[in-house]
Amino acid sequence: MASQVSLTAQGSGLSAPLNGPEHLTSTTVENDPRLLDILSRFNREKIPERAVHARGAGAYGEFEVTHDVSDICDIDMLLGIGKKTPCAVRFSTTALERGSAESVRDVKGMAIKLFTGDGEWDWVCLNIPMFFIRDPSKFPDLVHAQRPDPATNLANPAAWWEFVCNNHESLHMAVFLFTDFGTMFDYRSMSGYVSHAYKWVMPDGTWKYVHWFLASDQGPNFEQGNQTREAAPNDSESATRDLYQSLERGECPSWTVKVQVIDPEDAPRLAFNILDVSKHWNLGNYPPDIPVIPERCVGKLTLKKGPENYFEEIEKLAFSPSHLVHGVEPSEDPMLQARLFAYPDAQEHRLGPQFSDMAAKRTGHAANDAPKTKKPAVPLQKQSREHAEWVSQVTSSSWSQPNETDYKFPRELWAALPRLRGEEFQNRLVVNMAESVSQIPEDLRQKVYKTLALVAEDLASRVESLTEEMVVPEQRPRL
């Protein structure tokens, strides 16, 4: 009987008859359990990509305490100058898919997993110190507005601008995003902000509201961002390549970790609500009439090496704002409260129910995964009635409605740009906005101009003038 040799995926031969009715119901696959195993593993080797922050790059490093902060925290990792903690960091784009270009105008993510003696502590940061919304129920609409058109799968700036025009709290971050910070870009030069207020709790139950951030010691690198955008059609991986090549050269990027602190009794007296993540904690840049919340240095985070297997070591990491350690509590910020549920739920969908046990084992930090001794939780000291009434704002019907600070913060940002970065920096904001708005229908363009006028008349007029010059003839209204 004539026969041929079939090869499995591993190159092993298997004789298979070419003819004979008795063999019609018996296949090579059925006779080779190893091939069944190979194919089944291949079918399952990919996992669902993240709903946001799908495209990423990562590295390993360590955090070192450089300043004494024992007067404001009881966090073991931060107590003791010179104390070092290993960490894994994942950088990412935000809105687009895993295969998208890194150079697109987009918010960037910086997630840090610290392997402390008390367990994993995650810092889930963005490179912009505020967020688009304060009402978590709007989050799915926000993400959908940044996705490709569901009919054509093409970029859809109209959906994005429609969202901004209908949700004015997003104007602050929108103005920031259309500066060169939106494309300033390599991962080493961007800073990271946790954005939300957290609580640092002392042993006696007293506590402070805090916001911490990582200031890049390399950046910002606007020139690199402009070069990256120009090269985007030919190089969609420039930021990842820059990170890994710098580590191979022994150039270890670092970030200075700083914290801002507010007493809970002082929070209601500020001119904005620190539980509103669409606003930033003023460092002295803007607005000029809102109190400065000083920064304090905490430590230094330094990256040392890249992963040996990105998929296993970085892509399968599960970050969440709910991964906290003793001495840290979440604030009442509604967006943060929603993320405490949404992140673990998304990770379970992506990685399976055992995702929380994987990170330390994969990254080689299993020894630090479980606390050796667990400190008892400390009851938080109760605050005044004034503070309680202030906190109740986040559950009021007016919380998701526009208020004057939604226009004040972007207005002050727009006005401060020439002072902070120069007039040309402000001019490029106008150009960047016009390039985007020129791609949307005329009726929506008019809506955008009216919305921008709520921020600043000169911003609106300058964007309108340049946009209408850019509009292609087919988009102009016919007479």
From Swiss-Prot:
Q: Name one GO cellular component term.
A: mitochondrion
Pfam families from the xrefs? Answer: Catalase
Q: Which InterPro entries match?
A: Catalase, Catalase_AS, Catalase_clade1/3, Catalase_core, Catalase_haem_BS, Catalase_sf
List this protein's GO terms for biological process: hydrogen peroxide catabolic process; indole alkaloid biosynthetic process; response to hydrogen peroxide
**Main function:** Catalase; part of the gene cluster that mediates the biosynthesis of fungal ergot alkaloid. DmaW catalyzes the first step of ergot alkaloid biosynthesis by condensing dimethylallyl diphosphate (DMAP) and tryptophan to form 4-dimethylallyl-L-tryptophan. The second step is catalyzed by the methyltransferase easF that methylates 4-dimethylallyl-L-tryptophan in the presence of S-adenosyl-L-methionine, resulting in the formation of 4-dimethylallyl-L-abrine.
Binding residues for heme, per the UniProt record? Y343
Which parts of this chain are annotated as the region Disordered?
1-28, 365-385
What SUPFAM superfamilies does the annotation carry?
A: Heme-dependent catalase-like (SSF56634)
Q: What is this protein called?
A: Catalase easC
**Care to name a GO molecular-function term for this sequence?**
metal ion binding
Q: Which organism is it from?
A: Claviceps fusiformis (Ergot fungus)
Q: Keywords in UniProt for this one?
A: Alkaloid metabolism, Heme, Hydrogen peroxide, Iron, Metal-binding, Oxidoreductase, Peroxidase
Catalytic residues?
H53
Q: Does the keyword Iron apply?
A: yes
Q: Which gene encodes it?
A: easC
Question: What ranges does the record list as Polar residues composition bias?
Answer: 1-13
* Disulfide bridge partners, by residue number: none
Mind telling me which Gene3D superfamilies this protein's record contains? Catalase core domain
User: What Enzyme Commission number(s) appear in the record?
Assistant: 1.11.-.-
Needs which cofactor?
heme
* Family of this protein: Belongs to the catalase family.
Annotated metabolic or biological route of this protein: Alkaloid biosynthesis; ergot alkaloid biosynthesis
- Could you name the domain of life of the organism this protein comes from? Eukaryota
